[in-house]
Structures are given as structure tokens and as C-alpha cells.
Amino acid sequence: MRSTRAPQPDNKFLTLSSRGENLLTIPNFDRSGNATAEIPSDPLVTFAIDGADGSLSLVEEAPAGGRNPRGFSLNRDGTLLASALQDDNRVVVYERDVETGKLGRVVAWATVGEGDENGPNYVLFDE
């Protein structure tokens, strides 16, 4: 189910989050001895926008950083994307390539709230 969309500052790309798929896996943020090595993640799907006719072409389907990405945003220059993951009580910040629209490595993450009902549902850069 599509949940959130975010046009990039240059309007060359469109990113959508999808909830409830859990088709991707990522390394677990919890490094304790009893944690599993990988956890499920819903995708963030990025499309390139054709400037002439507005058509979309798939760029990538990347992990959102966990389950149920309720909201995400980009910083002003489009080099960072923050994802709010409600079911995992986590916010994850990725590098983003402004030329390709692709996400890079995780540069920061934080646990926010407790339980499925209290996880973050939106994240916004304050610049």
C-alpha cells in the first residue's frame, strides 16, 4: 500500500513509500547478542520524472530502514532522506545522490517511542 510521496527539490525524481510489504531485508540496527542479523524492511521506491511528458521510470526500490514507513522527507538540498518507521519505533537518515535519486548508506538512526502505537509517523528536516 502506497503511503507517502515526496517530490525532490529539483523535481527530477519522485519517491514513494510502501507499507506492509516487508519484502526487503537490512542489517539489524540492534547489535546486542540476542538480536537477529537481519530485519524486514518495506521499500522506498524512486522514479525519474521525464521533463518533457511527465512519465515515470523506475530508478530503484530501496529499503526504508524497517517496517511501516509512515512518513519521510528530504533536506533542502536533497542530499539526505529521513524515514519514520512506525512499527520499529525508528527514524533512519540515508545519504541521497541528487544526480541519480538513489539512496546511499545510513548516516544516522534513532529509536523513537515504544510499541506499534507510539512509533513515529512523520519526520521533517528543520533547516
Give the ranges of each region predicted by the language model.
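Feature marking well-ordered beta-strand scaffolds used for ligand recognition
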Residues: 1-127
